[in-house]
Design a protein with these regions (language model features):
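Pocket-edge positions in alpha/beta enzyme catalytic cores
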Residues: 29-32, 77, 133-134, 196
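Surface-exposed cleft-lining segments at the edges of enzyme active sites
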Residues: 71-77
Length: 209
């Protein structure tokens, strides 16, 4: 009999569901917000191992399930820009501001998602977890992105939605760390190291010096 993890997925992945059973959010302090692909794979594999499956089989099982999930992702392409993001990118482009992406996702997947949203060309540096030795909140990804964008730490502001992003910005010595949260009050509970918290890109104004 195949081992099956017990308990709700929402309990150990931090997923939030609506009454219809659809995922509508996730814990901003949890693994989906800050974990790398390898870390999330290990977390899921542990659940199978805890249910009695040998570790090597558990890892293979998770990778198989991930492959099936990615087929559906490729079909649906569920990547959409946050409200206000496109206008923000256009404003930055017109102002001559260099933009980069640093993410716990793989570089290839990130590039794909940016292409789906039609915003790939706005970024001159894309740094995924696979391009560095250490992930967030270590500043290595930021350091690489800055080098590729040819700007200094004093010229850079980081915008992110997890406190891991905020800590990474601090450790890199950036000018500021801006946290994005749907609600300012709840954002203050987990974006503890943000210099400023906004509800979205529409709250950020780009002005020429």
């Amino acid at each position: 009999m195949e081992a099956t993890p017990q308990g709700k997925v929402s309990d150990w992945l931090g997923l939030v569901y609506n009454k219809q059973g659809s995922v509508i959010g996730y814990d901003k302090t949890g693994p989906l917000a800050m974990g790398t692909e390898e870390e999330v794979t290990a977390l899921l594999a542990w659940r199978f191992y805890d249910a009695g499956m040998p570790w090597n089989e558990a890892v293979v099982k998770v990778r198989e399930l991930n492959a099936l999930a990615m087929i559906e992702v490729e079909r649906c392409r569920p990547a959409h820009p946050l409200p206000g993001l496109y206008d923000f990118l256009v404003s930055c482009s017109r102002a001559g501001i260099a933009l980069g992406v640093v993410t716990s996702d793989t570089t290839a997947e990130t590039l794909k998602h940016l292409e789906w949203m039609g915003i790939r060309n706005y970024f001159c540096s894309i740094v995924g977890r696979d391009r560095v030795g250490k992930g967030k909140p270590d500043p290595e990804m930021v350091t690489l992105a800055l080098r590729e964008m040819r700007i200094s730490t004093e010229e850079c502001i980081l915008i992110g939605d997890s406190n891991g992003d905020m800590i990474m910005a601090k450790r890199a010595g950036l000018q500021a760390a801006i946290g994005i949260a749907g609600d300012i009050t709840s954002g203050k509970e987990y974006l503890l190291d943000a210099d400023v918290i906004v509800t979205g890109y529409s709250d950020i104004t780009v002005q020429l010096a």
